[in-house]
Amino acid sequence: MENNIVNLEVEYFKRKNQEAYQTLMNKEFEKVNELLQEPLDKIEKSVKGETYCPQNIFEAGIFLNFLDKKVEQKDFAKVNYYDFYLMSAAANYNLNLLEKSREDYIKAIEFNPASSIARLQVLEIDKRQKNYATYLEDVKEFFKYAYRRSDIAKAYRDVGYYLYEVKDYEMALVAYYLSNVYEFTETAINEIKHIGETEKIDLDSKAWLSEKMMGEFHNKYKIPLLPSEKLTSLAIAMANDAESKKAFPVARFAYQVAYELTLEEGYLKKIEEMKNM
């Protein structure tokens, strides 16, 4: 739980957050680290136990429903500690201090396990350093919390990159194809073409898109082909509950998540119906 955090401290952290954010936007990365040193020291000394910093109502729902914590341990932070580690990680990444950046992203994940930003950046750093020891495990952990289509697409591209590196070319094609299912990008298309040309794979045959290949991809690497059913059920339940209570902003947000995970047009209609509520 949070210890020794009083209202004055909350204001202090808000001020430091704003200062560091503006400095980060100005790309003064060394100065960002200077500004963050004191608040990060305070966080290390003051925050004990399990504390969580959801960035939206759906992430709060993930925390309350799925994270493996005893009820009495659950605590929402008064201060967005997650942000401080995210900014430190970004500054260190831009200074090419990749190990420190990775450590900061891991710390950010501790405060917000549902952070796609931090999880995808850990994968990016591991790609740059060719550190693949826990790569697939980290990808699988990402998919437990992924609820944005663009993030899911990026994760599949990361898997495609990894599989190309380990010379599993046909499975890399499957990963890049799945990426485009969630968000079409020229990056994925170009990688597919590159693999086809360099490895002499007949892309026109579509054999690499077969149900058999999809099954092999899933069975071999245990990477899901679909978004988390738990998250989908949570989004729908949250949306229905919020709508019944006339909490329309929450309902719209949850229906948007449900749409991203399912592409069910009915959820878009729901959002439109509640647009002015």
PLM-predicted stretches and their roles:
Residues 4-6, 42-81, 143-152, 223-225:
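Flexible helix-coil transition and linker loops at the boundaries of alpha-helical arrays
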Residues 21, 90, 124, 161-162, ...:
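Residue-level recognition of tetratricopeptide repeat
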Residues 29-30, 98, 132, 169-170, ...:
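TPR-repeat structural position
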Residues 44, 113, 147-150, 183-184, ...:
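Short coil turns that delineate tetratricopeptide repeat
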Residues 59-76, 129-138, 161-171, 196-219, ...:
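Alpha-helical linker/edge segments of TPR/alpha-solenoid repeat scaffolds
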Residues 84, 118, 152-155, 188-189, ...:
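TPR alpha-solenoid repeat register
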